Amino acid sequence: MANLRKTHPLAKIFNNSFIDLPTPSNISSWWNFGSLLGLCLIIQIMTGLFLAMHYTPDTSTAFSSVAHICRDVNYGWLIRYMHANGASMFFICLFLHVGRGLYYGSYMLLETWNIGILLLFTTMATAFMGYVLPWGQMSFWGATVITNLLSAIPYIGTNIVEWIWGGFSVDKATLNRFFTFHFILPFIITALAMIHLLFLHETGSNNPSGLSSESDKIPFHPYFTIKDILGGMLLIMLLMLLVLFFPDILGDPDNYIPANPLITPPHIKPEWYFLFAYAILRSIPNKLGGVIALIMSILILAIIPTIHNSKQRSLTFRPIGQIAFWSLIADLATLTWIGGQPIEHPFMMIGQLASTIYFLILLVLMPATSLLENKLLKW
């Protein structure tokens, strides 16, 4: 009798995705982040579900309900901080996952890459709406500032903003709909992640050399299942270290002040994982220009496969390309730092410079280094 794992309609899908999947034998720990993102998503959905049981999406009780979760619900503080810091872990894994894709040329798997970009946008939207829910000062003013950006759209902008708000300012209706969307989006992310995997398994994984690995594949289980379990344990250790010892280190103290539409916080800034994009937004004096730059800072990832002109797929054997890549990482770190600083000299100027360099590296320097390396190798 044939193995049930290989014949049963449902088990067969699972088998071909996680057990008998032919995998390149040389994929490094940089390939662990896909499974870590899956783990993060599961943690976020589980903790979020339990938080939603006790949370009330109403302006008069939202802040109190979060305090109630932390004080009165059994292990509520643990669930709340796991959810808040889980989001940070999610974005750390996301950025490393995208960085890996850029370094090793995984963007050549077009469908997988484009769905990945869609996943990134959806996750950013989910995180933004989740940040509004505790209804602290930074929640309220963050929601006001970011939703207001849509008013930059010519002619219909103001109507769109008021439509999203459900009134003439961020209020009860806004909080309620943000809770609704924040609840539904993770399930949409799960569906997109499945499609992401579906397309990846059509072509098979890339590998650190950037060369074809058709001649050297090994089964996913047990080799990579055990490797992913190790990665997952390390992730949970790091998350619990944050949750149990430094739960508020990545948050903003202003969010422990209940939302007050009459008092503006001295510095309105998003969570750390949005600071690079926020710095790019602020570095352009024009509102519409800033919004376009903000969207393009992520959407530029979709252009990268079209401007890839190297004869090699990966940066493994391209030292000049590596310099460009690590310059980009340094530039993103600079943007993240600038995003958290007040808008004054010299931060404003550094931000504008770093924003310009960001787009220049991706659109000019990286293709230029590729051409130079092709020439040096007489290709």
UniProtKB/Swiss-Prot annotation:
The cytochrome bc1 complex contains 11 subunits: 3 respiratory subunits (MT-CYB, CYC1 and UQCRFS1), 2 core proteins (UQCRC1 and UQCRC2) and 6 low-molecular weight proteins (UQCRH/QCR6, UQCRB/QCR7, UQCRQ/QCR8, UQCR10/QCR9, UQCR11/QCR10 and a cleavage product of UQCRFS1). This cytochrome bc1 complex then forms a dimer. This is Cytochrome b. It is a multi-pass membrane protein. GO terms for cellular component: mitochondrial inner membrane; respiratory chain complex III. Heme 1 (or BL or b562) is low-potential and absorbs at about 562 nm, and heme 2 (or BH or b566) is high-potential and absorbs at about 566 nm. It comes from the Eukaryota. The keyword Transport applies. Its cofactor is heme b. Belongs to the cytochrome b family. The chain crosses the membrane at residues 33-53, 77-98, 113-133, 178-198, 226-246, 288-308, 320-340, 347-367. A ubiquinone binds at H201. One of its GO terms (molecular function) is metal ion binding. Heme b b562 binds at H83, H182. Component of the ubiquinol-cytochrome c reductase complex (complex III or cytochrome b-c1 complex) that is part of the mitochondrial respiratory chain. The b-c1 complex mediates electron transfer from ubiquinol to cytochrome c. Contributes to the generation of a proton gradient across the mitochondrial membrane that is then used for ATP synthesis. One of its GO terms (biological process) is mitochondrial electron transport, ubiquinol to cytochrome c. Its main location: mitochondrion.
